[in-house]
C-alpha cells in the first residue's frame, strides 16, 4: 500500500510466523502505531488484546489485529464480543491452514524426528475441512471477506478500515497465504472415523 491511509492506534499481533507479512502488508503510520505481540507460545491472546486496546484508545483511533489462523482457533468467540459491544476492530488473518510455527520449530529442534522424515505432523494441518473465517465471523455478527490474491488485499483493507473508522463496526479479512518451511507441502492428518 502506498502511504498511511489512517493513523492506526495499535496493532496487536498473535502470529509468530507472519511478522514479515505484517510489516509488508500493513504498512500504515508506523511512527504513531503501538505494536504488541505474544511471546512464549501464547496462542490465542490476540483477540482479547485487540478488544482491550480498543477500549483503551476509544472510538476515534483505529485498532488493527493481525493473527494467524492457528492463533484464531483459540479465540474466535471474541468476534461475538466485538459485535455485541460495537468494538470496531479490523482483524486481518494470515490463513495458511496450519499451525506453522509448531511445525517449523519441531523441524528445527528435532530435525531427525520421524515427523520430519515422513512429513507427517499430527494435528498441525488445519484443512480438510477448511475453516471459512469470514463466515465464522459473520455467524457471530461481524462482517468480513476472504482474500485469495495480493491484488485483492489493498481494496479489502480499505473496505475494512472504512467499516471500522466510519461505520464504527468490526470487520474481518481472511487472507489466504502460502505455507512455508519444512513440511509446508504436507497435507497429512490422521484420518479415523467413529
Predicted regions and their residues:
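Thiamine diphosphate
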Residues: 21, 25-194
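Active-site pocket-lining segments that scaffold enzyme catalytic pockets across diverse folds
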Residues: 1-17
Amino acid at each position: 500500500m502506498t502511504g498511511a491511509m489512517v493513523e492506526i492506534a495499535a496493532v496487536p499481533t498473535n502470529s509468530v510466523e507472519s511478522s514479515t507479512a505484517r510489516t509488508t502488508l500493513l504498512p500504515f503510520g508506523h511512527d504513531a502505531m503501538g505494536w504488541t505481540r505474544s511471546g512464549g507460545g501464547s496462542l490465542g491472546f490476540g483477540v482479547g488484546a485487540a478488544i482491550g486496546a480498543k477500549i483503551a484508545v476509544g472510538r476515534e483511533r483505529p485498532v488493527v489485529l493481525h493473527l494467524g489462523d492457528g492463533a484464531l482457533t483459540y479465540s474466535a468467540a471474541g468476534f461475538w464480543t466485538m459485535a455485541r459491544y460495537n468494538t470496531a476492530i479490523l482483524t486481518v488473518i494470515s490463513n495458511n491452514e496450519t499451525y506453522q510455527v509448531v511445525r517449523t520449530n519441531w523441524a528445527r529442534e528435532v530435525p531427525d524426528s520421524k515427523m520430519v522424515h515422513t512429513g507427517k505432523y499430527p494435528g498441525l494441518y488445519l484443512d480438510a475441512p477448511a475453516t471459512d473465517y469470514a463466515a465464522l465471523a459473520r455467524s457471530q455478527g461481524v462482517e468480513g471477506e476472504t482474500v485469495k490474491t495480493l491484488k485483492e488485499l489493498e481494496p479489502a483493507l480499505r473496505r475494512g478500515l472504512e467499516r471500522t473508522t466510519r461505520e464504527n463496526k468490526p470487520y474481518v479479512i481472511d487472507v489466504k497465504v502460502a505455507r512455508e518451511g519444512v513440511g509446508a507441502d504436507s497435507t497429512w492428518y490422521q484420518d479415523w472415523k467413529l
